């Protein structure tokens, strides 16, 4: 498939999961371009101007000696810059507050998995939900991750 990765399978995984589409050129990123995007977004921010460290990491990733978080490789760029939640594979939260629900929704919309606990010591902290609920309230949902999570928070807040 290409000359950058040792097997066609690795090339397929890179192209189908991690390579961004470059609209101007009508193609997907090559493996070195994906690595460079990750280095410029994640590594450069943490190593300041230490180009020796950046180059060592770049070479190690390109040669598959080390592998960074593939979620960070996939999301490096505007999405990761906006909110680093998308860089994580999974997260956890106890369901002990009504805000747990919209927080879980936001995290899931960022592409991160959410593990949760509904053990008695947690859910006993939640307020009781009324059996019947009537409301004329209209909730306007902004079509974004933040907007949907906020709307869920508003719906749940109406219950208490």
Task: Tell what function each PLM region has.
Residues 1-160:
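Extended catalytic cores of very large enzyme megasubunits
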């Amino acid at each position: 498939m290409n000359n950058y990765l040792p097997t066609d399978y690795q090339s397929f995984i890179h192209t189908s999961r991690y390579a961004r589409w470059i609209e101007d050129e009508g193609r997907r990123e090559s493996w070195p371009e994906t690595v460079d995007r990750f280095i410029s977004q994640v590594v450069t921010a943490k190593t300041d101007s230490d180009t020796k460290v950046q180059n060592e990491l770049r070479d190690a990733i390109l040669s598959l000696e080390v592998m960074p978080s593939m979620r960070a490789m996939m999301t490096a760029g505007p999405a990761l810059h906006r909110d680093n939640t998308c860089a994580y594979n999974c997260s956890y939260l106890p369901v002990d507050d009504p805000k747990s629900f919209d927080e879980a929704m936001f995290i899931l919309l960022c592409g991160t998995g959410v593990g949760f606990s509904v053990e008695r010591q947690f859910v006993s902290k939640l307020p009781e939900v009324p059996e019947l609920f009537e409301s004329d309230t209209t909730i306007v949902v902004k079509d974004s991750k933040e907007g949907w999570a906020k709307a869920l928070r508003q719906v749940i807040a109406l219950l208490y």
